[in-house]
Amino acid sequence: MEELLDRYGIKPLVGVIPDNRDLSLTDTYEQDPEFWDKTARWKEKGWELALHGCYHKYTTKEGGINPVNQRSEFAGVPLDKQKEMIRYGVDVLKSHNIEPRVFFAPSHTFDENTLIALKEESNIRIISDTIANDVYFENGFYFIPQQSGRVRKLPFKMVTFCYHPNMMKDEDFEELEIFLKGRHSNFASVQDMK
């Protein structure tokens, strides 16, 4: 994925799990001892590194204010606990020289308490998790529409596409490259957001 994005000059938004405790990931994939070195390289390239939850563990069956799934690390969790998780997650990223400006939750689910926790415990004011036709500003946050699954031509000014490279097949990479070949000039980084 990194090589493909570099080839077309794409500076992606990458979700970083501060302290991955998701057994579906930790029991399936070997821990990468060079992970934090990779994040430093991505940051050096101008990639945007986002806070992607805290532990990536689902503790509720709620969808919150973006109910695209009925499981969450955040939605339905008390404010004090969410503040603790946001603070801890940001501290872990900062310890690796990452100052997150963007948040997106595991399974894209969060609630009003998540927004309060982000305001009180971080400088994050951009959320890349919403169903909308355009970027909008509400309650002190910019919300960027997010489309799961695959890239496709959409009538929106700005949208993020959600990919999990560890789950992609060869044909998924081929489809992405075909799309990027013809449309890479339409991609923008988070820094370009106006």
Residue ranges and their predicted role:
Residues 73-145:
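Catalytic domains of cell-wall/extracellular-matrix polysaccharide-remodeling enzymes
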Residues 19-35, 57, 61, 79, ...:
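Acidic-and-aromatic substrate-binding clefts and catalytic sites of carbohydrate-active enzymes
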Residues 9-16, 126, 167-194:
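C-terminal domain-boundary segment and adjacent tail
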Residues 137-175:
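A conserved mid-domain beta-alpha-beta active-site/ligand-binding segment of alpha/beta enzyme cores
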Residues 1-45, 181:
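Active-site beta->alpha N-cap acidic-glycine motif
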